[in-house]
Amino acid sequence: MALLILLFLLPSPLHSQHTCSISKVTSLLEVNCENKKLTALPADLPADTGILHLGENQLGTFSTASLVHFTHLTYLYLDRCELTSLQTNGKLIKLENLDLSHNNLKSLPSLGWALPALTTLDVSFNKLGSLSPGVLDGLSQLQELYLQNNDLKSLPPGLLLPTTKLKKLNLANNKLRELPSGLLDGLEDLDTLYLQRNWLRTIPKGFFGTLLLPFVFLHANSWYCDCEILYFRHWLQENANNVYLWKQGVDVKDTTPNVASVRCANLDNAPVYSYPGKGCPTSSGDTDYDDYDDIPDVPATRTEVKFSTNTKVHTTHWSLLAAAPSTSQDSQMISLPPTHKPTKKQSTFIHTQSPGFTTLPETMESNPTFYSLKLNTVLIPSPTTLEPTSTQATPEPNIQPMLTTSTLTTPEHSTTPVPTTTILTTPEHSTIPVPTTAILTTPKPSTIPVPTTATLTTLEPSTTPVPTTATLTTPEPSTTLVPTTATLTTPEHSTTPVPTTATLTTPEHSTTPVPTTATLTTPEPSTTLTNLVSTISPVLTTTLTTPESTPIETILEQFFTTELTLLPTLESTTTIIPEQNSFLNLPEVALVSSDTSESSPFLNSDFCCFLPLGFYVLGLLWLLFASVVLILLLTWTWHVTPHSLDMEQSAALATSTHTTSLEVQRARQVTMPRAWLLFLQGSLPTFRSSLFLWVRPNGRVGPLVAGRRPSALSQGRGQDLLGTVGIRYSGHSL
């Protein structure tokens, strides 16, 4: 009997219960088999399982082939299952989350083929010593990778190249000593990087690239601060608000930045970002970023002109205009140097003294000032008589001129030097330091056959002035400064010295000015004025003043480069023209602007000054006109308004003859004489009032108390005059 009772109490095999709990989470079926002491996958799992928990069991090994028939499986948790190996011989096409944490895995197989849709992979707290280079191949959808708390000592190059959508990378608590330089290449979506608690000593140059990492954890490493850490130091300085100190159980978004947590292990835990880097090279190879603050100063360069006394031809090219045609065979260069500030230099000259000439000091100061201006100016002062027996001042061979604008050809037996002139100084009978770097040379008669592209004009001695295209002032004899780029030719037996660009030689007793635009004058052996003007006027501005006993300073703005050879160079471009026994005084120089500026009155400075004044006067006139109009309008309105008011009052009186307003006092009787209403030609006006009957609380109506009576007109005939009758209670109204 007892045995029958025991058999009845035993559970029937037909009614076996499930070992795992099943629940529905959203649209996925969740099966929880945690801590069931399982050694293999349960056989009674639902086929539509979407979330499977197998943690805290003793599985040992696991193969993805056992889950192939679970086509809806999306989340798989295998944490704390004492796994030592993982086999990926089955394809789980929908699996997105795989948790393999807290196991004994020492290696990982390739996961790309078996898990193509994987987005989160957690292999933390295992015993991984290394990773194969292709372990993540095929995981193009991976967004989170957790590898913390392993034994990783190094990472293969290109490990993360397949995972271009990676957002979180956790490599904390490993034994990493170094990182591959291109580890983060292509990870544009990466926002959180955990590298704390490793054995890192430095970060390779360019490791972070152009990534904007909002959350980075770098503390508790063996950072060694030397010259190799300068890149990492600069990155910390630039991203100080993105470096955090990790705290267990605290979300990264709840922590505060702490860049000082990254410390140097060899400098008493000093912050890496404050490492001074003394003695380290500062070459561009030390940094992998663009430093826009350290802009090196560009050294200013100056254009130098060299020319020689041999028979070769040299050509000068203006930087802003085309050079004149010439037969030059030398190389040509065009240079635009920057504008220089005024400089003061000294040049030493060796001079010889001739009888009757004023002695110049050996040391002369030159203050050339260069500015960026464009001018079309021709300087034409009066001619100056120059004897052919002048004394040459020979400069020493280490001074370079800054300007030259001529092309000069000298045959072998010629003694004509090539001076360049831009500044003219004519002090009177005294020894004055003159700003100069050029020399006036009185050549001997020579024959210089040189082809030229300018117009050749032969002028006989005369006193007839030739028309010019600029304002010409002919004061007392002086020296002419004419820039030119034409080729100079002096005929045979000429007694006229050959000037270049700015020196004009005029024989005695010649008063004939020479045209100053595109004209080359070649005199015969006579006392005729010789002048050279380029066929192409260079853009030049020259300001020339001649105070007594004061050097004349000329401000020039023209940049060009000329290649010449074998002649001592000059620093400035000034010509000193002596006269026998005295210096000629230059009282006046005509400064002629271009024809365009003369013909246009709007370019005149006086006109520009009067233009605002004119607009101001017009504005005042307009204001005055508007005020007068306003005054007239107000005056007209003042006269018109009274008439309008009279008309309105008349209309009101006409209307009032047919309207009467009566005020009746509230009393028992109102006496109204009929004579008051005789002027009304019609029926009597009707009155309408309201009568309120007050009802006492006891229900009685009336009699009416004092102060609550109907109007006087309603007594006796009130039934015809009353409009509406309202009934009110003592307490409230209906």
UniProtKB/Swiss-Prot annotation:
Residues 17-47 form the LRRNT domain. The record marks E588, V589 as: Cleavage. The lineage of its organism: Eukaryota, Metazoa, Chordata, Craniata, Vertebrata. Residues 634-734 are cytoplasmic. It comes from the Eukaryota. Platelet activation apparently involves disruption of the macromolecular complex of GP-Ib with the platelet glycoprotein IX (GP-IX) and dissociation of GP-Ib from the actin-binding protein. GP-Ib, a surface membrane protein of platelets, participates in the formation of platelet plugs by binding to the A1 domain of vWF, which is already bound to the subendothelium. Residues 1-16 form the signal peptide. The gene is Gp1ba. Two GP-Ib beta are disulfide-linked to one GP-Ib alpha. GP-IX is complexed with the GP-Ib heterodimer via a non covalent linkage. Interacts with FLNB. Interacts with FLNA (via filamin repeats 4, 9, 12, 17, 19, 21, and 23). This is Platelet glycoprotein Ib alpha chain. InterPro entries: Cys-rich_flank_reg_C, Leu-rich_rpt, Leu-rich_rpt_typical-subtyp, LRR_dom_sf. Residues 17-612 are extracellular.
